[in-house]
Regions:
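TRNA-recognition modules of translation machinery and tRNA-sensing kinases, especially anticodon-binding
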Residues: 2-193
Length: 193
């Protein structure tokens, strides 16, 4: 049911309806009623199950995490990449695997207006590889080292500390086979913690 539009009472002007005389609005202003838990979601304004708002009271924590991720990634010469939140579903079906739980049960998949199956990204690696190939990064000096952060989506069963929309920081190195890259990625992750 759509939320009803709330109107404020006024002390100016008049109201008029068909066949009725003009009457002055009430002179006394109505004081709003504030519930004991003013921070609780009002009916019709709740977040979807498994989703969470980031509020100003939490800003310092989120900005600190973003800043730390950025500083660490840049210290190891990773360049920032941002990929779309919405991708062609085929990208993840191919990269993650058709029979996997992520593809079969957890992806948010829907048809766009052109009848293309699209999804909210469940992870970022496939999108980064798509961008690498799509933008011809294989022709630039290798390896290509990128980092990202942002929201990912999986239709999991929400639990304490586990949401359907979650934020992920990650680093990818493409075009290098030396295992020293694995050691570097472990070091980056360790320094982030």
């Amino acid at each position: 049911m759509p939320a009803q539009k709330k109107t404020k009472p006024t002390t100016k002007g008049a109201t008029k309806s068909a066949g009725a005389k003009k009457t002055a609005a009430p002179k006394a202003a109505v004081k709003p009623v504030v519930k004991a838990d003013a921070g609780a979601n009002q009916k019709g304004y709740e977040t979807l199950r498994g989703m969470k708002d980031i509020l100003p009271k939490d800003e310092k924590y989120w900005l600190a995490a973003y800043s730390t991720a950025s500083n660490i990634a840049q210290a190891y010469s990773y360049g920032y990449i941002e990929t779309p939140i919405v991708e062609n579903a085929k990208l993840f079906i191919r990269s993650i695997g058709k029979g996997t739980d992520v593809v079969e049960k957890e992806m948010y998949v829907f048809d766009d207006r052109d009848a293309t199956k699209v999804c909210l990204r469940p992870e970022a690696t496939a999108s980064v590889v798509r961008a690498y190939i799509g933008h011809g990064m294989q022709s630039v000096p290798q390896p290509v080292k990128v980092w990202y952060q942002g929201p990912m989506f999986r239709h999991d069963r929400p639990q304490a500390g586990r949401y359907r929309q979650f934020h992920q920081f990650g680093c990818e190195v493409i075009g290098e086979k030396d295992p020293v890259v694995d050691a570097e990625l472990i070091t980056v992750a360790y320094n982030f913690l």
